[in-house]
Amino acid sequence: MNGKEGFAVWITGIPASGKSAITRELVARMNSQGLSAAVLESDVLRTILTPEPTFSSKERDHFYLQMALFGAMLARQGIPVIFDATANRRAYRDHARTLIPCFVEVFVSCTVDICRERDPKGIYAAAARGAASNVPGMQAVYEPPLNPEVTVDCREAPLINAEKIFTQIMALRYI
């Protein structure tokens, strides 16, 4: 690892693009090398930080600020961090980058049509029924990264995408 500081990988993409599957494979790849990481999964943290989420812009601003701060605290302790979170605004991810010097942004490129077909949590179906009104990539804006360190295709296997990310982490000498 690069000095005492940990590093962070923020895996972003619209809902159902495969972020969590890629995260699981990246953790497994790191574990295979004797490395561990703290995974900050937005779905899990949201149940703690916003138990009754509205997904409003104001709530998202606050939530992603907290998430970035948690990640920075861990990274300062030398703990690698993997963010598994849509973070629909660039500003959320850019803020984390300012807090964590060793930072890798990963964009999971995926069309809304593919995500709508996958829809494991039913959020696109809920949006179609009018029951969800803030789905990133549909009613809410999703701002893809301008210059991510890694871009992966959601149609590729999560294992292949995780290997691309791991290779970039190694190339940057974060591990």
Positions of predicted regions on the chain:
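Conserved substrate/cofactor phosphate-moiety recognition/catalytic segment
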Residues: 24-72, 76
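Conserved lysine of the Walker
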Residues: 19
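Extreme N-terminal, non-catalytic leader segments
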Residues: 1-8
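Small-molecule kinase domains that catalyze NTP-dependent phosphoryl transfer to phosphate-bearing small molecules
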Residues: 117-164, 172-175
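Conserved nucleotide-binding/hydrolysis micro-motifs of P-loop NTPases
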Residues: 44-46, 87-90, 109-114, 157-158
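Glycine-rich phosphate-binding loop used to anchor ATP phosphates in small-molecule kinases
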Residues: 58-104, 108, 124-127
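The conserved Walker
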Residues: 15
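Hydrophobic anchor at the beta1->P-loop junction of P-loop NTPases
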Residues: 11
